[in-house]
């Protein structure tokens, strides 16, 4: 699949893993960020977990096993987007990006990830709770917030990786 398509893995997280992550989120600190390399006036939230063992070892090993290729971790972090806090179209500057969607999801909320692959194919992925997507880090992409002010924050866990 590498560099040619988007890999989608539904129900990537066990219920225990999901609970562990949500417990961590409840106590973490968020920082403001904008899409890589952009001078956007709209920011969204981020929290780096690259140095947290549960994320950089346990879950990262599960991501690697699912990919089936040897990769090294560049960065792991949470993205948080409230209604109206959109990212910009951007690339990640890594070989592979994985996103694990964590928030509740309803189809009418939107919140999809839009990706443009090398062959100009556009892929739209809905952020189903517990779903993981993997895609070439250099493909142009954007994460959209949920559509309504009454929706929860759209939270994903991002892994940026390089081939070994």
Where are these regions (language model features)?
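Catalytic core of non-heme Fe(II) oxygenases with the double-stranded beta-helix
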Residues: 57, 61-164
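Non-heme Fe(II)/2-oxoglutarate
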Residues: 1-70, 81
């Amino acid at each position: 699949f590498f560099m040619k398509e988007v890999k989608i893995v539904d129900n990537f997280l066990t219920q225990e893993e999901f609970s562990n992550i949500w417990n961590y989120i409840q106590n973490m600190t968020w920082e403001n960020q904008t899409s890589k390399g952009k001078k956007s006036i709209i920011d969204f939230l981020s929290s780096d977990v690259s140095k947290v063992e549960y994320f950089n070892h346990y879950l990262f090993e599960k991501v690697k096993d699912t990919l089936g290729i040897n990769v090294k971790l560049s960065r792991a972090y949470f993205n948080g987007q409230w209604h109206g806090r959109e990212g910009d179209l951007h690339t990640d500057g890594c070989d592979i990006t994985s996103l694990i969607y964590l928030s509740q999801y309803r189809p009418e909320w939107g919140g999809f990830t839009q990706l443009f692959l090398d062959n100009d194919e556009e892929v739209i992925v809905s952020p189903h709770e517990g779903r993981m997507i993997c895609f070439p880090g250099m493909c142009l992409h954007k994460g959209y917030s949920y559509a309504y002010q009454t929706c929860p924050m759209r939270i994903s866990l991002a892994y940026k990786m390089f081939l070994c």
